[in-house]
Amino acid sequence: MTGNQMFCRENELDESFKQLASYINIPVGVLLPFKSQCFVRHYNKGQIVYYSSDETTHIYLLLKGNIMRENFNLNGDVYRYLNREKVLFPLNNLFQDKVPNEMCTALTDCEMIGIPRDLIEYLCKNHEEIFVKLFSLLSETQCQHIEYNMALTSKLAKERVTKILRYLCQTVGYDHDEFYEIKHFMTIQLLSDMAGISRETTSHIINELKEEKILFKNSKNWLVSKDL
């Protein structure tokens, strides 16, 4: 690696550290002594971040891009959770040995900083403000998961798709006054997989929402009216 490359990597890590410190509301100086234990990585679209959350020793802050986290239970059911930049994951790995089985995939090109799990646990024990922030983030994540799981209990297909779209607007959508924008990674097939209904049925429902002027396509992005 050349001197210029090393300088760029160092600057990249410094900038990522600032974003991490800002995200968990602490001075960047608290984190700097641990910089050598962390890394910044780029993942290409479709690349696996980790195959199983019980194998990863790090917690990640997603700096750019979108990811999908798939949780598998003992019955073989799959729950898919999507995230966009500025999310810390997997938080349910903290302070416990047995963790849910989860796989993480980059839906778009991504950039993230990895922090050792035991370092996060150490910082939580020694800095109350970090513990409070992470507890708040974990509670918010749990509420989002409950909302998604409740959407899956809807018996009517259109109601289920509509509720999942509302959930996606809150978790991966960008607020634009009267509508939310969901980036181009969203597809009929992915929405169908998340809803647990056929692609054909999902496509029919999406066409209905377009006719009702609730959902629009802008290039490859989805625009969802707040009247949904």
Curated annotation (Swiss-Prot):
Matches recorded under SUPFAM superfamilies: cAMP-binding domain-like, Winged helix' DNA-binding domain
Ranges of residues in domain HTH crp-type: 155-228
GO biological process: regulation of DNA-templated transcription
Pfam families, alphabetized: cNMP_binding (PF00027), HTH_Crp_2 (PF13545)
Binding site for a nucleoside 3',5'-cyclic phosphate: 22-141
Compartment list: Cytoplasm
Domain of life: Bacteria
Residue spans crossing the bilayer: none
Entry-linked CDD domains: CAP_ED (cd00038)
DNA-binding region(s) from the entry: 188-207
Record's keyword terms, sorted: Activator, cAMP, cAMP-binding, Cytoplasm, DNA-binding, Nucleotide-binding, Transcription, Transcription regulation
Gene Ontology CC annotations of this record: cytoplasm
GO molecular function terms noted in the UniProt entry: cAMP binding; DNA binding
Gene3D superfamilies: Jelly Rolls, Winged helix-like DNA-binding domain superfamily/Winged helix DNA-binding domain
Described function: Positively regulates the expression of the arcABDCR operon under anaerobic conditions, thus playing an essential role in arginine catabolism. May also control the expression of genes encoding proteins which are involved in anaerobic metabolism. Can bind cyclic AMP.
Protein name: HTH-type transcriptional regulator ArcR
